[in-house]
Amino acid sequence: MARKTAAEAEETRQRIIDAALEVFVAQGVSDATLDQIARKAGVTRGAVYWHFNGKLEVLQAVLASRQHPLELDFTPDLGIERSWEAVVVAMLDAVHSPQSKQFSEILIYQGLDESGLIHNRMVQASDRFLQYIHQVLRHAVTQGELPINLDLQTSIGVFKGLITGLLYEGLRSKDQQAQIIKVALGSFWALLREPPRFLLCEEAQIKQVKSFE
């Protein structure tokens, strides 16, 4: 019986977290209240306080409970094409899948909360994603899939700007966003395969890339 009670308590806690995500997106983190979260979860305010000390702790639980689609793990055996396709799939998930979209909206639109929790979580997700991209591109270079003199740092900087724009537009508008994301990321990959001069690095940097082989 005790085990069932613990399971029910965990189920209630998760319902509160899921409800809080929706309320934070709809009302904004600063304006959301525990009463609103409780009503959305179908529980009493007391039940919320039984699991959490306050709204800040609820927010912490929301941010810790989810992995953003763009927090990818690089697997060399997956191959370059499939590794890049994973980026496309993750981007589509981030702006279309209901809960992933809500989490994206929290990280992007609510990032200036006074606690700094959302900003820190956004930085964590961004750093992990950019690390993945760096691993994919570096592996592609060492495997001969991309030019040996490709400037990885500049390429990733350009890519970061592209992804930021796609996320903002993808969350804001539904019109042909899936197609735009596919075309934009496919075009960037084609650009990396035959990069213009300003995406190429000097000979000294090429030697540094070779050292990773």
From Swiss-Prot:
**Residue limits of the HTH tetR-type domain?**
10-70
Q: Identify the keywords attached in UniProt to this record, alphabetized.
A: DNA-binding, Repressor, Transcription, Transcription regulation
- A single Pfam family it belongs to is TetR_N
Q: Which PROSITE patterns did the record assign?
A: HTH_TETR_1 (PS01081), HTH_TETR_2 (PS50977)
- Record keywords: Transcription included? yes
Q: Which SUPFAM superfamilies match?
A: Homeodomain-like, Tetracyclin repressor-like, C-terminal domain
Molecular functions per Gene Ontology: DNA-binding transcription factor activity; transcription cis-regulatory region binding
InterPro entries annotated for this entry? DNA-bd_HTH_TetR-type_CS, Homeodomain-like_sf, HTH-type_TetR-like_transc_reg, HTH_TetR, Tet_transcr_reg_TetR-rel_C_sf
Keyword DNA-binding on this protein?
yes
As annotated, the DNA-binding region falls at: 33-52
Main function = In conjunction with SrpS represses the srpABC operon.
The name of this protein is HTH-type transcriptional regulator SrpR
**Species of the source:** Pseudomonas putida (Arthrobacter siderocapsulatus)
The gene is srpR
